[in-house]
Amino acid sequence: MSQVISLLHDKGGCAKTTSCVNLGFALWLLGKKVLLVDTDPQCNMTDTVDKTVHLEAESTIYDWLHDFKPGEKRSLPIYTRYDGLDYVPGSHSMSNINAELQLMYNREHRLSDFLDTVDPESGAKIRNMYDYIFIDCAPGGETLMNTNALVASDYVIVPTEAGIYSLQGLPRLLDYIEKVRTQLRCPVSILGYLLVRWNAQKAISKEVKAYYSNEEEVKAPLFPVYVRECVRCTESVAYEMSLFEYSPDCTAADDYMRVAEYLIGRKARPKTWTPRKWGQIANAAFQHFIKEREG
């Protein structure tokens, strides 16, 4: 069974999508089967993985959550970027989903029901087809869609910008997750805080690190790897690339790879596993993806 992990924060602009995409790609490069799920109406994850899917997709996560009925035969909204790296595209119509969920039976469990759906080809539940499933959540905290993500998840990763605004909203987020845990009786917990846009030269980065290092205060550990400030994070999105395809030797690519290695329990990186090596694998896969898409 996979680990289902939501990336969630009360505020926007804290690299949830960047972290979702690049952790997913890093784990794929490490040989894991990965599914990325986009529940944010901005669809930034979908646009990063494949911009054309909004024009060509027969089904998105919105279509499934909006009107799927148990027992109904319908193609799953799962698409393939690379062999072993799949994604469920989002939709701008997700801006309506919270109001629509209010009227639905079992409204907090729609996404969980989706992951429990049996794939007709493999005969396995979706959640059992992958090693890791990452859910890119919308900012805004306590919404029915985010509640769906928490109910469907085993863990939450909280990407946290190394700036003063990252401290705002944390008490609300912690209260929200605890309320979902207790009231809906789901076992979700915070896997850790992922410090992003880290700059060791800035005093505020050090202050934020010190705050999140107080596990008694923030109720979860801080990941031991910090994702450094890197302009390549913004640039790569424009080319529908992860960092590993766009700039495999940049600092952020190395940091996200180290976070992925931490997740799988790798204690030390083999000497042969270098930016050059993972860049070759990622670039070859990307060129094949573009060739296939262009027909």
What residues fall within each predicted segment?
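P-loop NTP-binding core
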Residues: M1-G295
